[in-house]
Amino acid sequence: MRIVIQRVSHASVTIEGVCKSAIKEGFMILVGIENADTQEDANWLCKKIVNLRVFDDENGVMNKSILDINGEILVVSQFTLHASYKKGNRPSYIYAAKPDIAIPLYEYFCKELSNALGKEIGTGEFGADMKVELLNNGPVTICMDTKNKE
């Protein structure tokens, strides 16, 4: 699984002109799933996300987690995170999992992340054409890949 985490002041996702989810301070997370991804990958990411200390403490030091600030999370599926651009100029998405594999794992990830956060999270709609708006705070943007845990 590959994710892009952005620390935001607020974020929302709109589908066909209707706001599906909106959050205030917290994380906007893009998630891409490939065929080899498992629930163990999702569990590892959930633990990392809720404990990631990238919010300022009283001294202006990034020392607080999303749990510490009672922040919110918006998750949006993003198969293009697995784009291959090795040959030519048109990306290939051959590494992105097909919906029959990706949807159950995406739903599992969202459920487990909500459990880890201790409250509901906002989500997009898998496979939909979405408009995502956010105000990146910092900016703070972090990429994680369960196949390359650095």
Describe these PLM feature segments.
Residues G88-A96:
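Short hinge/gating elements
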